[in-house]
């Protein structure tokens, strides 16, 4: 993931933004902020966002609407999103959020240690996903440049996964001893 990629935190309350920034500061990642869904969507569409912490209820465009839009746009559909709510999690909210591909749904105030753990995991997973996509594009470009070369370099031949694997011991070995122990 490019070094200019950041975590974007979105909430309409300044004190919540400050608390989230403070909780995430030990991770050492760049952090951006937005105070509305509209502003968040603009930043996400400009690029450079590797993870989004997004409040569910905000004036104007709410968190779920932002996620719905992001999932329809190819460049933003794989950005991990953690939704935050201060009103509790009901079944309808959780169902909608997870159907949209939200990574997690957390209650405010958020436990800083738990938040850092989840953010570290999701941010790193997204960074690895992007690196794999870049590598696939690079390999496809190489394959187009050199169409006559084999796709895979010579490598040791491994047995087919369905091949018979011998058992560790002959059938029936120690069976008499097992029967004797049971009696």
Where on the chain are the PLM-derived regions?
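Two-component/phosphorelay signaling modules centered on CheY-like receiver
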Residues: 2-6, 14-32
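Active-site residues of response regulator receiver
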Residues: 11, 55, 85
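Acidic catalytic/metal-coordinating carboxylates
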Residues: 12, 35-39, 62-68, 89
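Short amphipathic alpha-helix used as the core "switch/output" element in two-component signaling
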Residues: 42-43, 64-77
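Active-site beta3 strand of CheY-like receiver
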Residues: 48-54
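Alpha4 helix (beta4-alpha4-beta5 surface) of REC/receiver domains from two-component response regulators
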Residues: 65, 77, 88-104
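A Lys-centered signature of the CheY-like receiver
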Residues: 106-108
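C-terminal output helix
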Residues: 110-119, 123, 127
């Amino acid at each position: 993931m490019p070094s200019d990629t950041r975590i974007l935190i979105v909430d309409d309350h300044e004190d919540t933004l400050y608390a989230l920034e403070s909780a995430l500061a030990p991770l050492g990642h760049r952090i951006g902020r937005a105070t509305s869904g509209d502003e968040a969507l603009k930043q996400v569409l400009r690029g450079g966002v590797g993870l989004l912490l997004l409040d569910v209820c905000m004036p104007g465009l709410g968190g779920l609407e932002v996620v719905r839009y992001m999932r329809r746009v190819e460049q933003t559909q794989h950005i991990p999103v953690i939704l935050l709510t201060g009103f509790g999690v009901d079944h309808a909210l959780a169902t909608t959020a997870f159907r949209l591909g939200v990574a997690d749904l957390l209650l405010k105030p958020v436990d800083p240690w738990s938040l850092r753990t989840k953010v570290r995991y999701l941010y790193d997973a997204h960074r690895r996903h992007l690196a794999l996509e870049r590598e696939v594009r690079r390999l496809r470009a190489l394959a187009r440049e050199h169409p006559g070369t084999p796709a895979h370099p010579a490598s040791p031949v491994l047995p087919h996964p369905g091949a018979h694997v011998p058992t560790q011991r002959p059938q029936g070995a120690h069976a008499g001893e097992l029967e004797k122990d049971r009696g």
